[in-house]
Amino acid sequence: MSSAAMLTAEDSLEPTLQNLLDQKTLRWVFVGGKGGVGKTTTSCSLAIQLAKVRKSVLLISTDPAHNLSDAFGQKFGKEARLIDGFTNLSAMEIDPNGSIQDLLAASGGQGDDSMGGLGIGGMMQDLAFSIPGVDEAMSFAEVLKQVKSLSYEVIIFDTAPTGHTLRFLQFPTVLEKALAKLAQLSTQFGPMLNSILGGRGGLPGGQNLDEILSKMESLRETIAEVNAQFKDADLTTFVCVCIAEFLSLYETERMIQELTSYHIDTHCIVVNQLLFPGKDSSCEQCKARRKMQKKYLNEIEELYEDFNVVRMPMLVEEVRGKEKLEKFSDMLVHPYVPPQE
């Protein structure tokens, strides 16, 4: 079968991401996959396309490698910043390994020093750390609070490689459990603490226990709300990025099964780095690799017949900078037509 025939074969769904642009209710888009498959390039390109049809778009990197700055040739940090050349597309890079001390400080507690008299900061920290994954989840919660206040119409997450991605998606549940546990303990011990504190009603350092607990409850409610949104296919989807090789396909299948177990919608796969050597090509390596890629492309078609599978070519140069990203992004909505083999 020629590549052109493969491209135009009758599929149940079109081989583009146009459906994501048409889905006006979409609020959260996660882009993930194994390392080195073009995940950041894909997320940047999708963000560019979404910016054409949405009022305001935010692209967030949760990958510690932080490739957004390299992709756009512009420095990004933990505050949202407009991308050069765009009026409605912003980006930010966050560290998913945030610290619990930072969150306690943001919630009105300054750690053991300011709460030292009663050791309350240490108690909360120890309690929080007793729940696996809560340190990263705290950082995630802070991001959600910030993003929610910024009121972007759609948010795209350029996630860390596969394992980290799936853990990231569990954070809402993890943090909801942690905060519920702390709220329960505050109900049990709150009266005792207030009795110890006497009429001041405050903690050492001028903090107020009720204010801290109120902020924690507010954070828990935010997490619960976003957790529900993540499980709503009208609001959230996950775009899987892979290459046509065994390990990448294996990781993609594992990821899709886990996403399904979390009740998170996924119906788009982007297959990057495909070779399309011409029929007169003298590159034997290219032909051999194309033969292997065809085998895995066929498997992808069989496994994911109800997915939008986008086939992206291997390019001769890096996709960096606004102009090259825009050209690449165009192929996400207008299928690449390879030369006849």
Curated annotation (Swiss-Prot):
SUPFAM superfamilies: P-loop containing nucleoside triphosphate hydrolases (SSF52540). The keyword DNA damage does not apply. GO terms for biological process: tail-anchored membrane protein insertion into ER membrane. CDD domains: ArsA. One of its GO terms (cellular component) is GET complex. Pfam families: ArsA_ATPase. The active site is at residue 63. Its EC number is 3.6.-.-. Zn(2+) binds at residues 283, 286. It is found in: Cytoplasm; Endoplasmic reticulum. One of its GO terms (molecular function) is ATP binding. Its main location: cytoplasm. Keywords: ATP-binding, Cytoplasm, Endoplasmic reticulum, Hydrolase, Metal-binding, Nucleotide-binding, Transport, Zinc. ATP binds at residues 34-41, 245, 272. ATPase required for the post-translational delivery of tail-anchored (TA) proteins to the endoplasmic reticulum. Recognizes and selectively binds the transmembrane domain of TA proteins in the cytosol. This complex then targets to the endoplasmic reticulum by membrane-bound receptors, where the tail-anchored protein is released for insertion. This process is regulated by ATP binding and hydrolysis. ATP binding drives the homodimer towards the closed dimer state, facilitating recognition of newly synthesized TA membrane proteins. ATP hydrolysis is required for insertion. PANTHER family: ARSENICAL PUMP-DRIVING ATPASE ARSENITE-TRANSLOCATING ATPASE (PTHR10803), ATPASE GET3 (PTHR10803:SF3). Homodimer. This is ATPase GET3. It comes from Paracoccidioides lutzii (strain ATCC MYA-826 / Pb01). The gene is GET3.
